[in-house]
């Protein structure tokens, strides 16, 4: 089944990006020795709890949280996606990936400490675009990883989807088994 395209104008995108920056960058400022911390784990492993631990470990650092899944709610066609009962993840993917990349770029360019929350599924991209550049700009880089078995990731993803369907109407995250398998392999390559 083909996913409907929920296109938006460049002006609408820029307005959404500015709102994301306002909501997530807040008072964070450029630092002489900024930190990049990856909060990594397979899908539904519980990695979203890692930023709280990181901030506790670094109470004097003002981190920007970069989490592609959080940016989905800023999509300019969110109401239409909901009204159409469309696949939330597929319908917002291109948008949230673009926001994520621009937030990474913004933090790197401005030497702002940030936590990148994700599966580290595509390590090659992270290494070339983020890690190498962050090192060159003086970022201290760390990884906080939460590893679970592939089976646990699949069960947790299904439970999360069911809970989100119940509580978030059409804004649930459905994660395919093939994506979990791909993320598990990428995570092992990246962290293992």
Where are these regions (language model features)?
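N-terminal pre-Walker A segment at the start of P-loop NTPase domains
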Residues: 1-29
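Phosphate-binding P-loop
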Residues: 26-34, 107-108
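The conserved Walker
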Residues: 42-43
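Conserved lysine of the Walker
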Residues: 47
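Hydrophobic positions on the alpha1 helix immediately C-terminal to the Walker A/P-loop
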Residues: 50
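Conserved GTP-binding G-domain of TRAFAC-class P-loop NTPases and closely related GTPase folds
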Residues: 57, 155-192
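Conserved nucleotide-sensing/catalytic segment adjacent to the nucleotide-binding pocket
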Residues: 60-131
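Conserved phosphate-donor/acceptor-positioning beta-strand/loop module used by diverse small-molecule
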Residues: 135-157
């Amino acid at each position: 089944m083909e996913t409907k395209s929920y296109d938006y104008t460049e002006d609408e995108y820029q307005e959404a990006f500015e709102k994301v920056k306002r909501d997530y960058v807040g008072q964070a400022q450029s630092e002489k020795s900024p930190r990049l911390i990856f909060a990594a784990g397979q899908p539904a492993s519980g990695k979203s709890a890692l930023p709280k631990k990181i901030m506790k470990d670094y109470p004097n650092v003002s981190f920007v949280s970069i989490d592609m899944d959080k940016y989905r709610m800023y999509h300019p066609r969110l109401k239409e996606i909901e009204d159409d009962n469309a696949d939330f993840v597929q319908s917002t993917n291109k948008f949230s990936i673009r926001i994520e990349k621009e937030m990474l770029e913004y933090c790197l360019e401005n030497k702002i400490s940030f936590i990148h929350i994700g599966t580290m599924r595509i390590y090659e991209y992270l290494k070339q675009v983020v890690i190498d550049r962050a090192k060159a700009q003086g970022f201290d880089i760390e990884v906080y990883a939460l590893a679970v078995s592939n089976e646990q990731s699949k069960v947790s993803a299904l439970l999360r989807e069911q809970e989100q369907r119940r509580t978030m109407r059409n804004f649930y995250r459905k994660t395919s088994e093939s994506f979990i398998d791909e993320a598990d392999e990428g995570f092992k390559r990246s962290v293992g």
